[in-house]
Amino acid sequence: MAAGVRQSRGTAARKVGRRAEVIAALWLMAKGYRILGFRLATPLGEIDLLAQRGKVLAVVEVKQRTTIEDALDAVKPTQRERLRRAATHLAAHRAGLRDLLVRLDLIAMAPGRPPRHLPDAWGGA
């Protein structure tokens, strides 16, 4: 495959990912969450969305695939662990977050379907 084709596919995937994150943020806002950040880089990994509702700090992974089921299956154990470490690091090092209950959520998306939000998606993973 030519380098230009790979690059354009990567660019398209990033656009789809950003759009999915914006839709996920709007979905969470409609459910009463306050969005604290998008694509937050930590030394231990990136967090797609950071949201708060009450005393809960939701660290949200957003996955869009062709089906909701594929999106639900897209986060592998190594990625969950990286997300958990990044969440712990961010909560410990960002002012105002230390006293919140950190929870790892997943928002699964597919074209033509409403987002599916799974609070505590991996049972305290």
Swiss-Prot record:
InterPro entries: Restrct_endonuc-II-like, tRNA_endonuc-like_dom_sf, UPF0102_YraN-like. SUPFAM superfamilies: Restriction endonuclease-like. It comes from the Bacteria. Belongs to the UPF0102 family. Signal peptide: none annotated. One of its GO terms (molecular function) is nucleic acid binding. This is UPF0102 protein CCNA_00142.
